[in-house]
Amino acid sequence: MKLSRISAINWNKISDDKDLEVWNRLTSNFWLPEKVPLSNDIPAWQTLSVVEQQLTMRVFTGLTLLDTLQNVIGAPSLMPDAITPHEEAVLSNISFMEAVHARSYSSIFSTLCQTKDVDAAYAWSEENAPLQRKAQIIQQHYRGDNPLKKKIASVFLESFLFYSGFWLPMYFSSRGKLTNTADLIRLIIRDEAVHGYYIGYKYQKNLEKISQARRGELKSFAFDMLLELYDNELQYTDELYAETPWADDVKAFLCYNANKALMNLGYEPLFPAEMAEVNPAILAALSPNADENHDFFSGSGSSYVMGKAVETEDEDWNF
């Protein structure tokens, strides 16, 4: 049997500068959940009602499911269609960070929650029809044979589907609750923003190579898929937030991020401004300059603890 030749990646010869730009951004943003002092949120966690605690665990379990999908199936499914080896490398980084995100929710659970309650949330995630439905919609395109539809599905997952869950920790943070957990979620959101942007960029680059007619078909497909996901997400939001008065605010946040997902694909917004009007407190909590003082671009912040190496000389140790 003749083996195919393997080419070594050469980062000194790059055909698309965006690959290196995004690689540098992702690696400079690298973080781990162990560096965030989640235990500082234990007192705040204990002030939440039983309903709020259960909601939080279900939200984070749903997000874990989506991260698992993106880590195990999503990003790897995009690799065979990569145009450059550098694009493959970026996608491998994306896949790994999705595993870090999934690990992060387990860190929250082990720090704040009782095992029996977490187990109940995981059982809920396997039986919740809208949650399983959105994973199935995305997965069927990942397992398909159309590279551009895979990218559309990936952008909708990264830039839209996570946000019915992301709303809750931002809401708590805006009220001074679970602020360290919110810091961790901001790190995840920062990553997802880069992922959605990059995969959307690659989608648009690939569109340049096909006919106008095919572009029109893909645009129609994208809008139809988004509407299908949106209808399902409304049902998911209603079920998830049923015992709270927050569902309408979450739905506005969904519209806001659905429009952003379309922008990542190069398309115009679908939802009018009045449907996508997000509570300013939530947008402020999302900001890199929120109360937790996170620096989205260096990976540092009031809650993220990382040691720094400083060169010393022998005389520095003469106490």
What would you call each of these model-derived segments?
Residues 1-319:
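Non-heme di-metal
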